[in-house]
């Protein structure tokens, strides 16, 4: 009889422990913010955001402000080389300045004549909206229209706003061993 009571108590304790751990796990999962599912249109819109980015950086229109408009009001851009981030360009004026290559006008951008191509785009839902990784291939470096270079990749955070999908942040992760990003044809007034 004593063994039967002990067995019943042990069984009850095990069932109770399982119930408590299941409840705790469920509560933890409910408390965490789950990524919302992205629609097919969301994926298309994020890809179009990246295509508009390529055009904005290649053509430097509206003195860089068309580029800046691709970011949220508090959005930012930076580069990263060997795990160290460079200047953080945040806010409309600073992002427009980044699009101009820190020059006074779009006529002087160091990458003038380069075409930026983005490939291998991976988009993943996140609690904030989506994250992405995309490789950068540059064509037309150093004034040679046939020179092509892999220039690392971008790590992005995208958010859906009233204006559509925008960059919350974009980090250009330079390719390992890449000393600097190559320049385009020599812009007017810029010494190489």
Each language-model region and where it sits:
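Bacterial N-terminal signal peptides that target proteins for export
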Residues: 2-13
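Bacterial N-terminal signal peptides
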Residues: 11-21
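A beta-strand edge to alpha-helix "cap/lid" segment located at domain peripheries
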Residues: 26-40, 105-192
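Short, low-complexity N-terminal intrinsically disordered segments enriched in polar/charged residues
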Residues: 28-73
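Generic detection of long, well-ordered alpha-helical segments
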Residues: 43, 47, 89-92, 148
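Active-site micro-motifs of SAM-dependent methyltransferase domains
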Residues: 55, 77, 172
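A solvent-exposed, acidic/Ser-Thr-rich amphipathic alpha-helical stretch
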Residues: 64-136
